[in-house]
Amino acid sequence: MARDRRPAKKKVSKNIAAGVAHVNSSFNNTKILISDVQGNAIAWSSAGTMGFKGSRKSTPFAAQMAAEDAGKKAQDHGVRTLEVEVQGPGSGRESALRALAALGFQISSIRDVTPMAHNGCRPPKRRRV
């Protein structure tokens, strides 16, 4: 039996001038979240949501497409300047950053917030292929 669906809320166009782009680039995927300065999400995208599957998600091109998608959504909300926080060891870091710059955002700062262990947990064993 079909469930009753609530009417979808219309997305309110916020008018935010400055934001923070969080680029999370792992070995398997690249996620881009654009938030306001307080950390409330405005727009997000990832290589997986752009239709890439499997090992294609980890490519720089997939990261570029995801960054363009998130950037266009953020521009609809009025974001013009960005601080960029890059996290992770993936290959999509630079290409996502270049894609955001190419969209016309004024990038005020770039920070690498990759967590580094100060001799914490034991790492996983080396792969033998």
From Swiss-Prot:
The keyword Ribonucleoprotein applies. Keywords: Ribonucleoprotein, Ribosomal protein, RNA-binding, rRNA-binding. GO terms for biological process: translation. GO terms for molecular function: rRNA binding; structural constituent of ribosome. It comes from the Bacteria. One of its GO terms (cellular component) is ribosome. Pfam families: Ribosomal_S11. SUPFAM superfamilies: Translational machinery components. Part of the 30S ribosomal subunit. Interacts with proteins S7 and S18. Binds to IF-3. PANTHER family: 40S RIBOSOMAL PROTEIN S14/30S RIBOSOMAL PROTEIN S11. Located on the platform of the 30S subunit, it bridges several disparate RNA helices of the 16S rRNA. Forms part of the Shine-Dalgarno cleft in the 70S ribosome. Belongs to the universal ribosomal protein uS11 family. This is Small ribosomal subunit protein uS11.
